[in-house]
Amino acid sequence: MDKNELVQKAKLAEQAERYDDMAACMKSVTEQGAELSNEERNLLSVAYKNVVGARRSSWRVVSSIEQKTEGAEKKQQMAREYREKIETELRDICNDVLSLLEKFLIPNASQAESKVFYLKMKGDYYRYLAEVAAGDDKKGIVDQSQQAYQEAFEISKKEMQPTHPIRLGLALNFSVFYYEILNSPEKACSLAKTAFDEAIAELDTLSEESYKDSTLIMQLLRDNLTLWTSDTQGDEAEAGEGGEN
């Protein structure tokens, strides 16, 4: 199937909410080796975000059930085995994306904007792996996530306006990484607050086409700050990551 057909099929799959099909189409487009257009890049990102998001959500539910069934050995074993099955799926998806990023997407990125987008994506998918990692593996995975976010963050500060939705989305997710994965609420708050304040100070640089995206992410940054600085330290913190682009 040629590239245009694959892209059309991915759009059709998106409308049908068949994200596994959508991801498979965009994976094939990526493997053809050409740099992706903005539209193709967004289709790839949306597809995998939904595919991995379904597993992350299932994993949380089953993990919670597993913890609640302590003492009921049979039930707990069933929940544990099911959680492990979901984890395997989740890892396979993340490794698929990380392989596309390493082989094609990051090396082919010719603009700072694409480079930041893909490095942020690398940080995100290592973060999803870190959520389910345990033991010796975990530290290496967390380091990979942090390095990708940090590299993206440095490029974005040099090359992009503080109001750019990709720069803001990166700050949002990097701050969630500090809060959730590194358990560093101070660092998470400082990063989110700086990103929010810098964007507010330059609101006049907001371009018309990204106005909606940028203001939505600014709202999420502010919501997270409110949540993180209040005493309620619950896992709702993750909610702040839901509206990134």
UniProtKB/Swiss-Prot annotation:
Modification N6-acetyllysine occurs at: 3, 68
Compartments reported by the entry: Cytoplasm; Melanosome
Residue positions where N-acetylmethionine is found in the record: 1
Signal peptide range: none
Post-translational modification: The delta, brain-specific form differs from the zeta form in being phosphorylated. Phosphorylation on Ser-184 by MAPK8; promotes dissociation of BAX and translocation of BAX to mitochondria. Phosphorylation on Thr-232; inhibits binding of RAF1. Phosphorylated on Ser-58 by PKA and protein kinase C delta type catalytic subunit in a sphingosine-dependent fashion. Phosphorylation on Ser-58 by PKA; disrupts homodimerization and heterodimerization with YHAE and TP53.
Residues annotated with Phosphothreonine modification: 232
Effect of residue 184 to A: On DNA damage, loss of MAPK8-mediated phosphorylation. Loss of binding ABL1. Attenuates ABL1-mediated apoptosis. No loss of interaction with BAX under stress conditions. Inhibits translocation of BAX to mitochondria
Phenotype upon changing residue 232 to A: Loss of phosphorylation by CK1
UniProt entry keywords in alphabetical sequence: Acetylation, Cytoplasm, Host-virus interaction, Phosphoprotein
Site description Interaction with phosphoserine on interacting protein, residues in chain: 56, 127
A biological-process GO annotation: ERK1 and ERK2 cascade
A GO term, aspect molecular function: RNA binding
Superkingdom, natural source: Eukaryota
InterPro entries assigned: 14-3-3, 14-3-3_CS, 14-3-3_dom_sf, 14-3-3_domain
CC terms in the record's Gene Ontology section: blood microparticle; cytoplasm; cytosol; extracellular exosome; extracellular space; focal adhesion; glutamatergic synapse; hippocampal mossy fiber to CA3 synapse
The keyword Cytoplasm appears for this protein: yes
Any one Pfam family match given in the protein's UniProt record, by short name: 14-3-3
Positions where Phosphoserine occurs in the chain: 58, 184, 207, 210
Family: Belongs to the 14-3-3 family.
Subunit structure: Interacts with CDK16 and BSPRY. Interacts with WEE1 (C-terminal). Interacts with SAMSN1. Interacts with MLF1 (phosphorylated form); the interaction retains it in the cytoplasm. Interacts with Thr-phosphorylated ITGB2. Interacts with BCL2L11. Homodimer. Heterodimerizes with YWHAE. Homo- and heterodimerization is inhibited by phosphorylation on Ser-58. Interacts with FOXO4, NOXA1, SSH1 and ARHGEF2. Interacts with Pseudomonas aeruginosa exoS (unphosphorylated form). Interacts with BAX; the interaction occurs in the cytoplasm.
Summary of the function given for this chain in its UniProt record: Adapter protein implicated in the regulation of a large spectrum of both general and specialized signaling pathways. Binds to a large number of partners, usually by recognition of a phosphoserine or phosphothreonine motif. Binding generally results in the modulation of the activity of the binding partner. Promotes cytosolic retention and inactivation of TFEB transcription factor by binding to phosphorylated TFEB. Induces ARHGEF7 activity on RAC1 as well as lamellipodia and membrane ruffle formation. In neurons, regulates spine maturation through the modulation of ARHGEF7 activity.
Protein name in UniProt: 14-3-3 protein zeta/delta
UniProt organism field: Homo sapiens
Gene that encodes the chain: YWHAZ
